[in-house]
Curated annotation (Swiss-Prot):
UniProt-recorded name of the protein: 3-methyl-2-oxobutanoate hydroxymethyltransferase
Catalytic activity: 3-methyl-2-oxobutanoate + (6R)-5,10-methylene-5,6,7,8-tetrahydrofolate + H2O = 2-dehydropantoate + (6S)-5,6,7,8-tetrahydrofolate
Organism taxonomic ancestry: Bacteria, Pseudomonadati, Campylobacterota, Epsilonproteobacteria, Campylobacterales
Binding site for 3-methyl-2-oxobutanoate: 43-44, 82, 111
Keyword check for Protease: no
NCBIfam families: panB, PRK00311.1
Organism encoding this protein: Campylobacter fetus subsp. fetus (strain 82-40)
Amino acid sequence: MKKVTINDLFMMKNREKIVMITAYDALFARLFDDYVDMILVGDSLNMSFGGKNETIGLSVDDMIYHTKAVQNGAKKAFLVVDMPFGSACTPQIALKNAIKIYKKTGCDAVKIEGTKEMADTIKLLSQNGIIVMSHIGLKPQMSRFEGGYKIKGKDELSAKSILEDAIVLESAGASLFLLEGIVSSVASEISQKLKVPTIGIGSGASCDGQVLVWSDAFGFFDEFKPKFVKRYLEGATLIKNSLKEYADEVKNSKFPSSQYEYTK
């Protein structure tokens, strides 16, 4: 099975939609690998995997551990790793951490949240051979600072600012973009103006591809569902029903039956 490369993704822009999903371990990465073009080891793991209410709190070593696990399961998909909160606060710190992630995980790219102020950081990383996905629009790592998760591009000033971010960061060397929580018309304009692929989450259908957090898409997190999430499976219900059946069989001495026992 051919490994997806950055050149493959460039070729897909305006030709074929790019499919991306999150993964945090080898088991699910292996399941997803045949059906997606890209896998994101996102800091969303702090929420869906760690049970927190925000992405802040992860370390570079946390991301490395989970990326290694995903790498063990996914052999085809283009693998992107989030730079966690605080790991890219200066260009030199970002370079040091990105090199560490690159060397220890074998990932294909790192993702950095930020506006045009991150241009120097992205330029330095790309000059050192590191592929960068720039994350613009709604930036979860800024949720405390902004007082929550707020959709971007609703007014002319906001829309103009996001478009400027995209153009500046592409010029700095960003090879990919993640557009999150952006009004669809604005995301469409960004995708048309950029030469590199855009992956959307909550940013409409005009992006070059889409990404979802796997536990959202498959219904394993049933406490809250954002507007942009389509559930393709009611996973939590299936697991609960299966677990109830297992528990009932154990309580009533129906499992294990002789079929599942070793004999002389």
